[in-house]
Amino acid sequence: MIIVTGGAGFIGSNIVKSLNDIGYRDILVVDNLKDGTKFVNLVDLDIADYVDKEDFVASIVAGDDLGDIEAVFHEGACSSTTEWDGKYMMDNNYQYSKDVLHYCLDRSIPFLYASSAATYGGRNDNFIEDRQYEQPLNVYGYSKFLFDQYVREILPEAESQICGFRYFNVYGPREGHKGSMASVAFHLNNQINQGENPKLFSGSENFKRDFIYVGDVAAVNLWFWQNGVSGIFNCGTGRAESFQAVADATLAFHNKGGVEYIEFPEKLKGRYQAYTQADLTNLRAAGYDKPFKTVAEGVAEYMTWLNRTV
């Protein structure tokens, strides 16, 4: 059996899909379906069982035998960069991750988990997996950073796989439940379908992010599991592309409308990553040599998926 925490969420459900694609059906999804809309991410996927996150935590803390587990993909977390309840964030992202990690270590189960480029904070270069480059801007980034630090202490002595991925700006299918935290491509598509012009912040040609297609993220996860590689790795494309490029690709698909520029919100100033670009040196050195989709390629594929029933 393979366990995917956050399996009804964005990246988790895409990992389930990729596992299905290579023949895995014996999958336990762990999630919190208080937001019932997330069920749509699983309706076309095959899983063996579903367990509520709170019940799962109780089981692993109690040391229950969950059977023969081939791997745990730990994607379950609060991913809102605008959430400032630090206790909630640390319980969900830090303590929960430690509990799952130790369950896996005690049983030699491969543990692959979601970190984040938010660990780097507001820097505009040297996105390198090293302490000197890490200074998160928000409590979400801090919770991810602190768990990475915890893992770093354990890695040298670990006798089973521990692998963390610092996801950069992920977009693609199965993110609709994320609301305001969904990708720019998702929101631009909605605006066009509602008859509006797509909206970007003024200066968006200068805001550049490393946008990575979720299918590529899932492929990275599966490759590292199948190859038993441990460590903490950036998971981006190695390219910084502008929000304008995302809008251009969205408009190219719809072949209508033009961008409307709006003022940058005061509340985001100083807490906003204006630039991200993954350094892939360590990822490539580990042996992962597959190409990553460009924004033009990934957004075109995503638009086809989003508009398949529109």
UniProtKB/Swiss-Prot annotation:
Substrate binds at N169, S180, H187, F201, S202, G203, S204, R209, Y272. Pathway: Nucleotide-sugar biosynthesis; ADP-L-glycero-beta-D-manno-heptose biosynthesis; ADP-L-glycero-beta-D-manno-heptose from D-glycero-beta-D-manno-heptose 7-phosphate: step 4/4. CDD domains: ADP_GME_SDR_e (cd05248). It comes from the Bacteria. Keywords: Carbohydrate metabolism, Isomerase, NADP. It catalyses: ADP-D-glycero-beta-D-manno-heptose = ADP-L-glycero-beta-D-manno-heptose. GO terms for molecular function: ADP-glyceromanno-heptose 6-epimerase activity; NADP binding. Binds 1 NADP(+) per subunit. NADP(+) binds at residues 10-11, 31-32, 38, 53, 75-79, 92, 144, 170, 178. The keyword rRNA-binding does not apply. The active site is at Y140, K178. Its cofactor is NADP(+). Its EC number is 5.1.3.20. The keyword Transport does not apply. GO terms for biological process: ADP-L-glycero-beta-D-manno-heptose biosynthetic process; carbohydrate metabolic process. Contains a large N-terminal NADP-binding domain, and a smaller C-terminal substrate-binding domain. Catalyzes the interconversion between ADP-D-glycero-beta-D-manno-heptose and ADP-L-glycero-beta-D-manno-heptose via an epimerization at carbon 6 of the heptose. Homopentamer. Belongs to the NAD(P)-dependent epimerase/dehydratase family. HldD subfamily. This is ADP-L-glycero-D-manno-heptose-6-epimerase. The gene is hldD.
